[in-house]
């Protein structure tokens, strides 16, 4: 949808799919419609960057992979600017031709990324809205104007853009547009993402009522694994709510369903303290290896870390601390002295102490923390987090220290 103009289409630069919905709904699978939108794409050579504020890329990198060092891609800056009253007046003048407000689109869109026209209607008191100009890639002139998602007529979009000082001469590759699409009721799926109605048919991604790349990718991983297991007759693979955000997402979809495009947030996970970036390897590596989707070197890398963590935790749990010997050192570190002897693990649990500074005053701990030089900090941090959360790498103790996967807040 661009204004009153409607064109059939599939994924970006692909044709529409016809009759697919009809071919499976006749078996009892239910369907409904949702919408999404996208902003205008701008030629960066036509942008006056001197009238924008630069937002540089991150310098503190946290990589997805735990395996060694990886090349850091060149960081390209984003740029910010704002709409103004003239922009708003132009957009408001075209609301009669907006598919969102002339009855052309009836389906539900995503709550958390509204179109620019929706912002104007919903927040009429706002004099400006922030816009973020983002590069589409390192070797292209195409830029994405985040915050300006729209399905207004192209001439209205362009006229409004030209009232923004930095975009006064902007040239566009394509206008913003809205899309309506079919989705299928995810409560008709098992946790494996196999249909309850048609055996061997798996659903993943936007067709399940989700929005977002990561949401689709996570479902695709689970559906793909289970499709392969289905072909070999093996037991299905399912993730629980306390094991991964993918598990939370799939459980929400299959038990609660959706009435708007679903996006994954940490707030949806009642066990989010267990679902951290720094413990993804402990939660998922062994499962992935058993499924054959993690290579041996990744498994060995994790087992080395796991054994080192267990060694440190075991040492802390059994190493006795005498108050007379440790108190002067604790006072020097600015922490409360002990009233009685304890185990080292009780000191580790103090939030303002860490293994690094404790190892400087307890030589035996320093020896126990011996690990690959490039992984000492990673292993020590994980050991501390594991200790403080009451979790242990021992499966029996681990299962006793966390709540049932099916519990609900």
Residue ranges of model-derived segments:
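Residues forming the flavin
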Residues: 1-290, 294-295, 299-300, 304, ...
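Extended, charge-enriched "interface" segments that sit outside catalytic cores
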Residues: 268, 285-409
């Amino acid at each position: 949808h661009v204004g009153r103009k409607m064109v059939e289409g599939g994924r970006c630069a692909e044709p529409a799919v016809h009759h697919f919905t009809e071919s499976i709904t006749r078996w009892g699978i239910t369907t409904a419609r949702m919408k999404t939108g996208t902003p205008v794409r701008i030629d960066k050579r036509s942008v006056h960057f001197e009238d924008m504020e630069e937002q540089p890329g991150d310098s503190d990198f946290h990589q997805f992979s735990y395996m060694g060092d990886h090349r850091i891609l060149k960081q390209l800056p984003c740029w910010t600017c704002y709409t103004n009253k003239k922009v708003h007046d132009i957009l408001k003048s075209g609301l009669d031709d907006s598919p969102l407000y002339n009855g052309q689109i009836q389906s539900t869109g995503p709550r958390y990324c509204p179109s620019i026209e929706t912002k104007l209607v919903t927040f009429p008191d706002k004099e400006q809205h922030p816009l973020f100009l983002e590069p589409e890639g390192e070797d292209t002139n195409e830029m994405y104007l985040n915050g300006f998602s729209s399905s207004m007529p192209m001439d209205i979009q362009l006229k409004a853009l030209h009232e923004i000082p930095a975009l006064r001469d902007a040239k566009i590759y394509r206008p913003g547009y809205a899309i309506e699409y079919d989705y299928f009721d995810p409560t008709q799926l098992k946790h494996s993402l196999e249909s309850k109605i048609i055996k061997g048919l798996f659903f993943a991604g936007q067709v399940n009522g989700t929005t977002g790349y990561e949401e689709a990718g996570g479902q695709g991983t689970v559906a793909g694994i289970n499709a392969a297991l289905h072909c070999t007759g093996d037991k299905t693979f399912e993730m629980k709510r306390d094991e991964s955000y993918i598990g939370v997402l799939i459980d929400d979809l299959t038990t609660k369903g959706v009435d708007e495009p679903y996006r994954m947030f940490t707030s949806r996970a009642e066990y989010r303290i267990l679902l951290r970036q720094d413990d993804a390897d402990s939660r998922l590596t062994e499962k992935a290896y058993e499924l054959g989707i993690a290579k041996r070197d990744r498994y060995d890398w994790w087992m080395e870390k796991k054994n080192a963590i267990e060694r440190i935790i075991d040492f802390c749990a059994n190493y006795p601390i005498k108050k007379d010997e440790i108190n002067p050192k604790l006072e020097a570190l600015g922490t409360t002295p002990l009233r009685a002897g304890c185990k080292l693990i009780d000191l580790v649990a103090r939030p303002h102490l860490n293994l690094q500074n404790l190892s400087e005053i307890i030589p035996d701990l320093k020896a126990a923390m011996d690990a690959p030089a490039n992984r000492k900090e990673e292993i020590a941090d994980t050991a501390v987090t594991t200790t403080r959360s009451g979790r242990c790498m021992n499966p029996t103790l681990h299962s006793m220290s966390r709540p049932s996967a099916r519990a609900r807040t």
